[in-house]
Amino acid sequence: MKKPLNSAEEKKTGDITKAEIEAIKSGLHSNPFALLGVHETPEGFSARCFIPGAEEVSVLTLDGNFVGELKQIDPDGFFEGRIDLSKRQPVRYRACRDDAEWAVTDPYSFGPVLGPMDDYFVREGSHLRLFDRMGAHPLKLEGVEGFHFAVWAPNARRVSVVGDFNNWDGRRHVMRFRKDTGIWEIFAPDVYAGCAYKFEILGANGELLPLKADPYARRGELRPKNASVTAPELTQKWEDQAHREHWAQVDQRRQPISIYEVHAGSWQRREDGTFLSWDELAAQLIPYCTDMGFTHIEFLPITEHPYDPSWGYQTTGLYAPTARFGDPEGFARFVNGAHKVGIGVLLDWVPAHFPTDEHGLRWFDGTALYEHADPRQGFHPDWNTAIYNFGRIEVMSYLINNALYWAEKFHLDGLRVDAVASMLYLDYSRKEGEWIPNEYGGRENLESVRFLQKMNSLVYGTHPGVMTIAEESTSWPKVSQPVHEGGLGFGFKWNMGFMHDTLSYFSREPVHRKFHHQELTFGLLYAFTENFVLPLSHDEVVHGKGSLIAKMSGDDWQKFANLRSYYGFMWGYPGKKLLFMGQEFAQWSEWSEKGSLDWNLRQYPMHEGMRRLVRDLNLTYRSKAALHARDCEPDGFRWLVVDDHENSVFAWLRTAPGEKPVAVICNLTPVYRENYYVPLPVAGRWREILNTDAEIYGGSGKGNGGRVQAVDAGGEIGAMLVLPPLATIMLEPEN
């Protein structure tokens, strides 16, 4: 316990006590702005500074005029004295020691940057541009270049910004506390872009916390380092007006959307095994997706994260594109390049939880600030991570502003929101007694619901054309319905039931499929209850599950035929499409983030055939309105053959107003069938627009010679078809 100051120790040096000097020197003073810098006195102006290592200090105006010499009042570098100024203004100190001389622009002689309106909007949770005010931003203040820093730490006793620019000394740039909001801020003159920095925080109980990265940092160091980095504002010259206007004007549910899911660190690598830069990715990935016919690229999280095997899902920097692939400007160039050729860019976004790394958000100011204090609410047992406190206004604002930031600054086309089910249920992955009911005694996380509704409302309200997609694995109602109709407000939802049932079916031996016919028909009972995306994602090809081709039943020929028929089934089925990288050419091995995809497989005809099929499926899906314009509406689907269990044959019709219908027929046993009758809506010639058994795709080349004749036999219209083995065909009327 500290000894109380006696009267001798309280003796003043000028207007400052020895105790105050000691508090500044030891980093325990919470408001150095009251002591340091330029101050007006009855006799004029005086200046005080703390410059460790200095023996002499003189004071200059910013334009270099000498205005006074300061007296050393403490040998550790404390100086004060009268200065010749006519008005209060920032000053620069010239410090000397032996033969060394250096200049220090006084951060304590500048006023605050944030204003009362910032405080007002922060308090009520309606500040929608926090990304321009919080964190580190370049600023020219009173003619001086520097960076403004701001961080939320309401329970801290003291917060300093430390970095390369002050030798990581927490006594040099102690921040100003705005008590109405709990935000600390400082303008640090002469700090330039590219400096590593963190926040040094003295907790509520006086304990010095581990140095914290900036929650709003727009750039970070490459792992294993974990400091934030001062970054210039983005100056990307955007050339994507046509792309953005298109998506802002259309009904996304009626557009073809085919998503290529990519892990940026392992799609391709350089020959030495290092990551491609954003510019290298742009030069290879964008043309590849254009050729393949995908409409969107969806990246697994590219926000800063310390641990490669987390794939980015345990992020410590929601506002910073990871340094693994270069600077943020590189990512902006990638998005711009994709938009110029009409490809959208989606980001996998993780607002459900955050890792407990000591430099991150956990226990940020010495209290449970971003997370719940009670582990029954604030700890995720599946991932050993912390759960955001969605009921706290500042936390909700942090996350919502992040969603807006990616749309605003990087022109992203949408966010796929990870682990929504874990956000919606208080008892998610918890046993009895391990969770706290809501105010009505239920298991629904009402705070999370309000957060998701507000996030979606603001994203769609401020950025027309941007979409949000929920990864939600339960039957929570109205996930993709508007908020004003009682929904969560997402644009789309992943159809996990489709993925589970269809993978189960196609992994079965064909001889057993007749007993599991409902696995492919049941999904149509709920296919239009949400706006669905059909996901064959990274989750299905990791953790011992095997790749998609490896999941298929049978010998190698049957595996390829099964996967081709499965892709044909999926691209003909109502819903938007998503396919994880490597599965388009039937990579045999499971995905690993440690290296590139097995691109060498493309030299083999069966693998190259699979890639050609996916390409042609995308082009067919995009060019035939019947296959996409009613993906989310029941009037665009009709069964033609639904109950042929014995032969494992399925057929349905896809339609759109004013467009030619497309019939999709799947023969899911290895039996070649001739003269198989399928009812069709109109008589006449129907063209075979796609056949997954074509030789060009690696199939046996069986089919209908390019067309069939539908005849009207007494009011019943249909055609006798050849059904290739383990294949999907698509037909379209010629007229």
From Swiss-Prot:
Record-annotated disulphide pairs? none
Instruction: List the pathway annotation.
Output: Glycan biosynthesis; glycogen biosynthesis
Q: Where is the active site?
A: 418 (nucleophile), 471 (proton donor)
Classify the source by domain of life. Bacteria
What GO molecular functions are on record for this protein?
1,4-alpha-glucan branching enzyme activity; cation binding; hydrolase activity, hydrolyzing O-glycosyl compounds
Which Gene Ontology biological process is one annotated for this entry? glycogen biosynthetic process
Which UniProt keywords are given for this protein, alphabetically ordered?
Carbohydrate metabolism, Glycogen biosynthesis, Glycogen metabolism, Glycosyltransferase, Transferase
Which InterPro entries does its entry note? A-amylase/branching_C, Branching_enzy, GlgB, GlgB_N, GlgB_N_E_set_prok, Glyco_hydro_13_cat_dom, Glyco_hydro_13_N, Glyco_hydro_b
Q: Which GO terms describe its cellular component?
A: cytosol
Provide the E.C. number(s) assigned to this enzyme: 2.4.1.18
One Pfam family here: GlgB_N
Q: Which SUPFAM superfamilies match?
A: (Trans)glycosidases (SSF51445), E set domains (SSF81296), Glycosyl hydrolase domain (SSF51011)
Could you say which protein family the record assigns here?
Answer: Belongs to the glycosyl hydrolase 13 family. GlgB subfamily.
User: What is this protein's function per UniProt?
Assistant: Catalyzes the formation of the alpha-1,6-glucosidic linkages in glycogen by scission of a 1,4-alpha-linked oligosaccharide from growing alpha-1,4-glucan chains and the subsequent attachment of the oligosaccharide to the alpha-1,6 position.
Q: Which PANTHER family match?
A: 1,4-ALPHA-GLUCAN-BRANCHING ENZYME
Q: How does it assemble?
A: Monomer.
The name on file for this protein is: 1,4-alpha-glucan branching enzyme GlgB
Its taxonomic placement starts with: Bacteria, Pseudomonadati, Pseudomonadota, Alphaproteobacteria, Hyphomicrobiales
